Amino acid sequence: MPESLQIGMLQMDAGPDKEVNLERIGEGISDLRGNPDIVVTPEYMMGMEDGGVTRELVRKNSEPMRSGYVSKARELAEANGVALLTTAYVEEEDDIYNTSIFIKEDGEIGGTYRKVHLFDAFGHRESDLFSWGDGVTVVNWNGIKVGLATCFDVRFPELFRIMNFRGADLILVPSGFYAGEHKGKQWETLINARAHENNFFVAGVNHPEPHFVGRSIVSSPLGYEVERFGGDEEYGLVEVDLGEIKESRERMPIKKLARHKFYRRFAPYDGD
C-alpha cells in the first residue's frame, strides 16, 4: 500500500444531457490542482433535470455497459492518467441499474457496483427507475482495496461491515443526497460513522445545493474529517495518509473483535 493517496472530488451539478455532463467531468479533472490519483464524481451523472431523476430521462439516457458513454469515460481516465469513479444508468436485458464504475488510470474497468439500497424514502421511489443490485464490490487497485457504495447505502451499515470483512481500505460513495430538514447533518454523521466503525477511509461526493446537501466529505478511520466541502459547486484535491488505516486497526481491531458466530445466530432477519 502507498503511504498516501490524492483523491479528487468533483462536487458538481448534472443536467439532462449526458454528453455535456461527461464533458464537465473532463473539465473538472483538468481544473483540479495537483496530481490526483483518483477522481470521484457524484451519483446521477448520466442525467438529471430540475434537481431530480425521472423514469423518462433514465430510460432515454441509459446504455449498455459496452457503450459510447462508458467508453468515453474510460478515455477520460486514460487521457488524464487518473483512476475515475463515476456513475451510469446501465441497461442489461430488461433491467436498468444505477451503476458505479471504477475505471483505472489505463482506461480499463476495475470493477462495477449496482446500487443495492434504492431510495424509496422521503417521498421518492427510486425502485420505479432502477432494478435492485445484489452484489458487493471491492476492487484491488495499486495495493489498495477500494469498496464501492452509492448514496442511500450509507444508511445501511451492514454493507460497509461486509466490505470491512473483505479487507477494504477505502470506500468511495458517489451520491445524490437530497436536501431537507436535518439532511446535511445526517449525511455528515453517516459518512463519519461508516469510516470510524470500520477502520477505513470513506469519501462521499455529492451534488451541490440547493437540491442536494453538498458537503462532500473524506472521513478518516481515526474518527475525524480530513476534508468537508460547503454547499456550493466545488472541485478539490484531498490527500489522505493511508498509514492511519493501520494505526486505527491496531488501536481498535474491529474485524478481529467482531463476534461472527454470535451475529449468525440472529441472521438472516426475516422481518417486515
Place the predicted regions along the sequence by residue.
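Cys-nucleophile CN-hydrolase/nitrilase-fold catalytic domain and related Cys-dependent amidase chemistry
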Residues: 27-106, 178-196
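Extreme N-terminal starter segment of soluble prokaryotic enzymes
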Residues: 2-8
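Short polar catalytic/cofactor-binding loops
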Residues: 11-16
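Short, acidic/polar
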Residues: 20-29, 156-161
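Active-site catalytic loop in hydrolytic enzyme cores
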Residues: 91-166, 179-189, 193, 250-258, ...
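Structural motif
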Residues: 37-38, 146, 170
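CN hydrolase (nitrilase-like) catalytic-core segments centered on the catalytic cysteine
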Residues: 62-85, 154-236
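C-terminal beta-strand edge segments of enzyme domains
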Residues: 112, 138, 207-272
